């Protein structure tokens, strides 16, 4: 145990929710991790404390100028009762990249991993064992200086909270989703903050997501901000197309989030001898490939669902049914392989899991 991390014992333990009705982000565990930052002092007072509301000044910078970044990863319960984390080091590195872009102080990556591990270990009983469930881990940093001046805050709070979550697919069966291609609103611009996991990016996506939902679609496929034709990402996922037996995914251009599941999928697909092209691809190319019968699969990758097959794309009322509208072979193999690694059923070729 890192003795630098203090612990305060709770006097009240919550009743654990019914694992069959967890949903996403509705329940929270007994403890949270907290650490503070002041300019001239640095990060200090790391502690695990009872989960509780925060007290913040109404003029705290986070409320006015959006200095807020976060991460999302999961802890999984194996069949033999162990608890595994999936590539937590990559999430922590990405958190620091987000901090840098938002002019926020970097975190000690070893300390963050230790804090995360200690917190999950303390809350092991909250990691559900039912199929498709997991313990969602949300690290985040917010600006706390009480000031209305437009400048980087001089104080911050870093926290980690935990939430038991159910299967993204409800019954844990892969289901193809319907995607609306958005060419009015944009998610990010070159030179902006698209590669950072910052709160404002998600706020900016909500109106388009609402529009897509009202039209009967599940997710939004974002295009580039300049020409509005080059594919970027889908909602909270990166996107892949299988064209002529090759996997094609948009290159990381600075306006696309560098997904941990995306990177894992690329490594696995290549290890299976299937070519992966990371390049600019327009929505017109996707539709043309479909017309030629060469587009056999589309899928998204992300922490929430791991792999999400896409059965339909729509832009300006023009619909493309992907493959036969069902789950493709590569989507299924990827989902099964990554989830088997996360659940400790197979070790996998890359040593991606960390036991708590």
Curated annotation (Swiss-Prot):
It comes from the Bacteria. Pfam families: Aminotran_4 (PF01063). GO terms for molecular function: L-isoleucine-2-oxoglutarate transaminase activity; L-leucine-2-oxoglutarate transaminase activity; L-valine-2-oxoglutarate transaminase activity. CDD domains: BCAT_beta_family. The modification N6-(pyridoxal phosphate)lysine is found at residue 197. GO terms for biological process: isoleucine biosynthetic process; L-leucine biosynthetic process; L-valine biosynthetic process. Pathway: Amino-acid biosynthesis; L-isoleucine biosynthesis; L-isoleucine from 2-oxobutanoate: step 4/4; Amino-acid biosynthesis; L-leucine biosynthesis; L-leucine from 3-methyl-2-oxobutanoate: step 4/4; Amino-acid biosynthesis; L-valine biosynthesis; L-valine from pyruvate: step 4/4. The keyword Amino-acid biosynthesis applies. This is Branched-chain-amino-acid transaminase 1. The gene is ilvE.
């Amino acid at each position: 145990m890192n003795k630098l991390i203090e612990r305060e014992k709770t006097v009240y333990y919550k009743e654990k929710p019914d694992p069959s009705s967890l949903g996403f982000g509705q329940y929270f565990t007994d403890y949270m991790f907290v650490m503070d930052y002041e300019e001239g002092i640095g990060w200090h007072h790391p502690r695990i404390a009872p989960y509780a509301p925060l007290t913040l000044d109404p003029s705290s910078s986070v409320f006015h100028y959006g200095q807020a970044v976060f991460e999302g990863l999961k802890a999984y319960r194996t069949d033999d009762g162990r608890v595994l984390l999936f590539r937590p080091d990559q999430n922590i590195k990405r958190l620091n990249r987000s901090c840098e872009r938002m002019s926020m102080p970097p975190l000690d990556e070893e300390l963050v991993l230790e804090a995360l591990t200690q917190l999950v270990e303390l809350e092991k009983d909250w990691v559900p064992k039912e199929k498709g469930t997991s313990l969602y881990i949300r690290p985040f940093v917010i600006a706390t200086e009480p000031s209305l001046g437009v400048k980087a805050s001089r104080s911050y709070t870093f926290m980690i909270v935990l939430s038991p979550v159910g299967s993204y697919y409800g019954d844990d069966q892969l289901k193809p989703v319907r995607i609306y291609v958005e060419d009015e609103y944009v998610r990010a611009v070159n030179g902006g903050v698209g590669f950072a996991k910052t709160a404002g990016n998600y706020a900016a996506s909500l109106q388009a997501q609402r529009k897509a939902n009202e039209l009967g679609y599940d997710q939004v496929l974002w295009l580039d901000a300049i020409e509005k034709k080059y594919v970027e990402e889908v909602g909270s996922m990166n996107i892949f197309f299988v064209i002529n037996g090759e996997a094609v995914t948009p290159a990381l251009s600075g306006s696309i989030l560098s997904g941990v599941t995306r990177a894992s999928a690329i490594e696995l697909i290549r290890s299976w001898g299937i070519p992966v092209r990371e390049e600019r691809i327009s929505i017109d190319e996707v539709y043309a490939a479909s017309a030629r019968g060469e587009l056999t699969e589309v899928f998204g990758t992300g922490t929430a669902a791991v792999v999400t097959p896409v059965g339909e794309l729509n832009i300006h009322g023009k619909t493309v049914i992907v493959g036969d509208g069902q789950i493709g072979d590569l989507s299924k193999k990827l989902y099964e392989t990554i989830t088997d690694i996360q659940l400790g059923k197979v070790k996998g070729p890359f040593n991606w899991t960390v036991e708590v």
